[in-house]
């Protein structure tokens, strides 16, 4: 009989543990404790499909921090929320914390030296926020456009007017590439 079961490939149910009672293997979010209760409520409302995200619903209590985040300072207390209006609605937004300063800064990836020519990245020379070390807002910095990287189309050799925007140049290049059947080395 045992060999017959193996040949058919049937699975058998596991035997209960030797303790005699049901095993105590509750998921972590159902275990007793004040830290896990908000997570359990969030999970229950999501899994059951009864999550009601309308403004009239009582909000869930704040979720506890993960152990790796407990030692970090609270970013909400250091950065005030900003408000912006779209149409007739006003939204609040908490900006991201400022980037860490030091050798790992990625600012050098986007800013070319002042003397570099042909850089497609706009220069932010006139931005006082970057000089002071804080995050600039959209109103503070107006990018200064660098000269065009291409003076003429490499496909049709048409000279680009200096008054053309980068979008116009890109549009022309895309049109020429779409019509071209030859390989071009840039």
From Swiss-Prot:
Role this protein plays: Component of the Fanconi anemia (FA) complex required to recruit the FA complex to DNA interstrand cross-links (ICLs) and promote ICLs repair. Following DNA damage recognizes and binds 'Lys-63'-linked ubiquitin generated by RNF8 at ICLs and recruits other components of the FA complex. Promotes translesion synthesis via interaction with REV1.
Keywords: Chromosome, DNA damage, DNA repair, Metal-binding, Nucleus, Phosphoprotein, Zinc, Zinc-finger
Chief localization: nucleus
Chain spans, region Disordered: 1-30, 50-90
Molecular functions per Gene Ontology: K63-linked polyubiquitin modification-dependent protein binding; polyubiquitin modification-dependent protein binding; ubiquitin binding; ubiquitin-modified protein reader activity; zinc ion binding
UniProt signal peptide: none
Entry's localization field: Nucleus; Chromosome
A Pfam family of this chain: UBZ_FAAP20
Gene Ontology terms describing biological process: DNA damage response; interstrand cross-link repair; translesion synthesis
GO cellular component terms given for this protein: cell junction; chromatin; chromosome; Fanconi anaemia nuclear complex; nuclear body
Phosphoserine found at: 119
Domain note: The UBZ2-type zinc finger binds both 'Lys-48'- and 'Lys-63'-linked polyubiquitin with preference for 'Lys-63'-linked polyubiquitin.
UniProt name for this protein: Fanconi anemia core complex-associated protein 20
Gene: Faap20
Quaternary assembly: Component of the Fanconi anemia (FA) complex. Interacts with FANCA; interaction is direct. Interacts with REV1.
Zinc as UniProt keyword: yes
ZnF (UBZ2-type) intervals: 150-186
InterPro entries on file: FA_core_complex_assoc, FANCA_interact, UBZ2_FAAP20
UniProt-annotated binding residues for Zn(2+): 153, 156, 172, 176
Compositionally biased spans, kind Basic residues: 7-16
């Amino acid at each position: 009989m045992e060999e017959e079961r193996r040949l058919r490939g049937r699975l058998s149910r596991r035997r209960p543990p030797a303790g005699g009672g049901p095993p105590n293997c509750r998921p972590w979010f159902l275990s007793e404790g004040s830290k896990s209760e908000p997570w359990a409520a969030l999970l229950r409302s999501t899994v059951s499909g009864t999550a009601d995200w309308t403004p009239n619903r009582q909000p869930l209590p704040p979720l506890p921090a993960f152990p790796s985040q407990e030692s970090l300072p609270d970013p909400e207390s250091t950065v005030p929320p900003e408000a912006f209006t779209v149409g007739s609605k006003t939204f609040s937004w908490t900006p991201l914390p400022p980037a860490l300063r030091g050798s790992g800064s990625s600012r050098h990836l986007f800013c070319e030296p002042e003397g570099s020519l042909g850089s497609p990245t706009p220069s932010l020379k006139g931005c006082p926020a970057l000089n002071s070390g804080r995050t600039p807002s959209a109103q503070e910095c107006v990018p200064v456009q660098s000269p065009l990287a291409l003076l003429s189309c490499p496909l049709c050799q048409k000279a680009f007017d200096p008054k053309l925007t980068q979008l116009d140049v890109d549009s022309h290049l895309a049109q020429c590439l779409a019509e071209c059947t030859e390989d071009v080395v840039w």
